[in-house]
Amino acid sequence: MDKLRLLGSYLRKSPLTSTVSEPGIKISPKQFTFSVRVRDKDRPSKISTTKINEPASKLENTSTVVHNEYLNSLQLPYLARTSLRVSKYDYKRAAQFSNTLKRTLKTQDAHERIFSISSEDVAKLISSLFQVSEDNVSLVAKKRFFERECFTEIPKITEEVLSDIQEFEDYIGLLTHTKFHHKGSSLQDGIIPKLLKNLLHPSNLRIAPLKTASVFNDVIYYYGNKNNFATCRELYAQMKSEGIAPNVQTYNLMLRNLLRNSRLIKQQLPYREAIFYLERMKKENISADVITWNTCYFLLKDNISRAIFLEKMVERGVPLTYHLLYGILEEEDIPFNVIIDFLRENDIPVDTKIIKICHRSLIKRDKFQASWKLMEYARHLNFRVKDPFFLEEYLRQFSEKGRMDMCIMTVNTFKATFEVEPTLHCYDLLFKCLVRQGYSSEFSRVYQMLLINLKEHTGGHVVMNYWIAKCRAIMNSNIKTIPTHDSITRLDALAKRCIWDKRGIKWNCWLEYSEYRNVFRRLGSVPYQSNSRDQLDKHEVAKSSKKKVKYLKKLKETAIRNKQSHDAAYRNDYYSALKNDLINRGIIEEQAK
């Protein structure tokens, strides 16, 4: 809350500024040509989990060799991963520094102590920002919008994509911003990262004229979200070596990656690396925008530095934006009443983003009734509450407690009242809830019901995750009879009748919504049997045991073995295997060989 008070003191000098955004362009998979799936007859089936045919390190070595070949083709010897390290990364020293920093932040004089060791770097950081800022620091409008997830094959690489720079930029933007679940395309070892590296390969002469700063920015964004910061730095170096000038978005992404990386175990504070990027901006005559200033603010670790930074922002005329406020509210776990008081004191109007932050604050404190009233209030005032965010927040809390009854009622109510359909993450949470609830005679029927609804959402695909695998393991160990299709259909029809009404969200829905007790029984949501009302309030959650560690290890080993079987061709000839994969999936034409 210290950061919030600090911001409030400067809002009197410089009120919050809104980013005036022009209507952005939505880029959807539907804009591109979809492939016709070709069945690969030679595709190996999943192998048994009882044997390990080859060591897992073999596939990792193949990936390393391919990546080294990529780096060597850049001819940039200063890149860290172009040669073997003389000495290994001192993880022990990094852990010691990070632990010391955490302990220091908990002391009474934390801010004074941290400022004393970093004041020079903070001063240089602010000075560097001044040098790359114009008189009027620009606001940034969002120009492109992408769909959150897609369950079809990735779009086909057509001649239109390969002959037009704008089409190519949109195509790369789609691959890097939309999560494609089909065959795990967007995963770390999926087809998308392989395709991106092949397209951006220095020896790919056909793509060379299509490479722009926007293309590299999108790929840096993609790897930054996967915490692959080394690849981001290599892409930045590749841009410069190929004569593609970075822009302010490039440096904002590198600073954003630095911010994400600083939250991991590190050997030093992130200020010097930030100064390096700012000095590069000065050398290349690139002006900082509001995002640059905001990102640098969140790099700071102590309130003294933050106060100086905000003072200099106001002095330089940098607008204090809502994005800065959102970041502070999300970074600290601030109670709902404190947020409301802050907004009232500083005369800040409420928008949808602030509604979301307040909603999350209430949910974290189990104030479900208040959070529901907040949503009703926002809906009547025409705020955009038709957002899966709110549904996911409820399900995240209910699933942790194993409350399948509350999860199902919440999903149904969001469909009926807010016209919000559950996302893939919502289904992940529902399967988690089923596991947390524990085994009952209805376990298999509820699982099959959720699976049918999931397939309706994904178009027939089952996107595997830990909780689905856990459900299957529980059924293999316990299930005696297989539920019929009719019984599953009846359960689904009954479950969809359960919704929250004017009574609101009640933790004791067994008592408050007694008309649904028969459905709750069928869902396996029978409360702890006791005469004590206090005991009834406490739901017994199925606790994980030591077996969980062994189970996760077995899942990992199974995945590695199946991957080895599928990627055998990549170990023999990586690029030929990649071409065959793209052709078999219809992403490129066969004559493109």
UniProtKB/Swiss-Prot annotation:
Required for respiration. This is ATPase expression protein 3. PPR repeats lie at residues 212-246, 247-288, 351-385, 387-422, 423-457. It comes from Kluyveromyces lactis (strain ATCC 8585 / CBS 2359 / DSM 70799 / NBRC 1267 / NRRL Y-1140 / WM37) (Yeast). Its main location: mitochondrion. It is found in: Mitochondrion inner membrane. It comes from the Eukaryota. Keywords: Membrane, Mitochondrion, Mitochondrion inner membrane, Repeat. One of its GO terms (cellular component) is mitochondrial inner membrane. The gene is AEP3. It is a peripheral membrane protein.
